Regions:
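Conserved, mostly hydrophobic/aromatic
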Residues: 17, 53, 86-89, 125, ...
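C-terminal domain-boundary segment and adjacent tail
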Residues: 6, 55-56, 147, 159, ...
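A conserved mid-domain beta-alpha-beta active-site/ligand-binding segment of alpha/beta enzyme cores
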Residues: 168-202, 206-208
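Generic structural signal for well-ordered alpha-helices
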Residues: 46-50, 73-77, 105-112, 137, ...
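The substrate-binding groove and active-site-proximal loops of carbohydrate-active enzymes
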Residues: 33-40, 59, 63-66, 91-102, ...
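Catalytic domains of cell-wall/extracellular-matrix polysaccharide-remodeling enzymes
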Residues: 71, 95-174, 221, 225-229
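Short, well-ordered coil/turn segments that N-cap beta-strands
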Residues: 8-12, 56-60, 81-85, 119-123, ...
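Active-site beta->alpha N-cap acidic-glycine motif
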Residues: 1-82, 236
Length: 260
C-alpha cells in the first residue's frame, strides 16, 4: 500500500515564498534598485503565477512574511480568494536563529498579527533561509501550528521529532536543489539548465512513489522564460492522473492521519 491518497502514486508539492521586498527593508534599505526587485512580485509575477495556477487547476501554498501582508494586502486577498493557502514565513524575512530569544518572540507575534489582518490563521511555517531552531519549534507548538517545511533529511513527509520527542508537527521536507533562488539568482543558470536539474529529480521521485517539494519565489520564477519552464515541468507531471498536487495544509493533514 502506498503512502498517498487512493489513486495517487506520488506527490508534487509546489510552493512559493512570497518575500517581495521584506528582506531588503533591513538588509539594503537605501538601495532603491534592490527594493524594486522585490516589488516585481506583487506588481507582475504574482498575478501571472495565479493565472498560471488557474489554468493548471492547482491550489498551492504561499509562505508569506508579515511585511508582505502589511504592504501588499490586495495581493494576499487575491491569493486567498483564489483558493490558495497562505502560511507563515517570519515578519521581514529575518534570520531567526541569529536573533535573541526576545527578538524572535517579537517576530513571531508580528508575523501572526499581520497574517490575521488578511484573514489568515497560519497552519504551516517555513523559516527564511531555512534557519530553523529549537525556539521556533517551541513557538510553533505554542501557537498551534500543524506543520513545518524546513528539514532536509527525507523525501517524504514525516512526524517531526526533536531530541527524540514528538513535536506534534508534520514535516514537509525541503532541499536546496529544488529551490529556484540559488540556480537563477546566484548561479545565473538559464531556464533550460534548471529544467535539466529538476526534471530527472521529479521523474525519479515519481517512479519511487515519493514527494517532490519545489520551492519558488515570485520575483525570481515569475520572469517570463522561467515561468514558461515551470509551466512545462508541471504540465508534464500532470499528464499522468496519479500525481497529487496538494496545498501544504492538505498534505500535512493527510500525513498526520496516515502516520499517527
Amino acid at each position: 500500500m502506498g503512502f498517498w491518497p487512493k489513486g495517487y502514486k506520488s506527490c508534487f508539492f509546489l510552493s512559493f515564498d512570497y518575500d517581495a521586498s521584506s528582506a531588503e527593508t533591513w538588509k539594503t534599505p537605501d538601495d532603491l534598485s534592490s527594493l524594486s526587485k522585490g516589488r516585481y512580485a506583487p506588481r507582475v509575477a504574482v498575478p501571472r503565477i495565479l493565472d498560471l495556477l488557474d489554468r493548471l487547476e492547482i491550489k498551492t501554498t504561499f509562505f508569506t512574511p508579515g511585511w508582505t501582508c502589511d504592504n501588499h494586502r490586495d495581493s494576499l486577498i487575491d491569493i486567498v480568494s483564489r483558493g490558495h493557502e497562505v502560511a507563515a514565513h517570519s515578519y521581514a524575512h529575518e534570520r531567526m536563529t541569529e536573533l535573541s530569544a526576545e527578538k524572535e518572540a517579537e517576530v513571531w507575534e508580528r508575523s501572526i498579527a499581520a497574517l490575521e489582518r488578511v484573514g489568515v490563521k497560519p497552519q504551516g511555517y517555513r523559516a527564511p533561509y531555512w534557519m530553523f531552531g529549537e525556539r521556533s519549534i517551541n513557538h510553533m507548538k505554542r501557537l498551534g501550528f500543524k506543520y513545518s517545511s524546513n528539514m532536509m533529511d527525507e523525501d517524504i513527509p514525516y512526524l517531526l521529532k526533536h531530541n527524540g520527542v514528538d513535536t506534534g508537527l508534520v514535516e514537509l521536507p525541503v532541499e536546496w536543489l529544488l529551490d529556484d533562488w540559488p540556480h537563477f539568482e546566484m548561479d545565473r543558470m538559464g531556464p533550460d539548465e534548471v529544467y535539466r536539474l529538476w526534471k530527472p529529480e521529479w521523474e525519479g521521485l515519481h517512479e519511487l512513489g515519493r514527494y517532490f517539494g519545489l520551492t519558488c519565489h515570485p520575483e525570481c520564477i515569475g520572469r517570463v522564460s522561467r515561468l514558461k519552464m515551470l509551466e512545462r515541468l508541471v504540465t508534464e507531471a500532470k499528464k499522468g492522473s496519479d500525481v497529487w498536487f496538494p496545498t501544504g495544509k492538505e498534505l500535512s493533514d493527510w500525513a498526520s492521519k496516515k502516520l499517527k
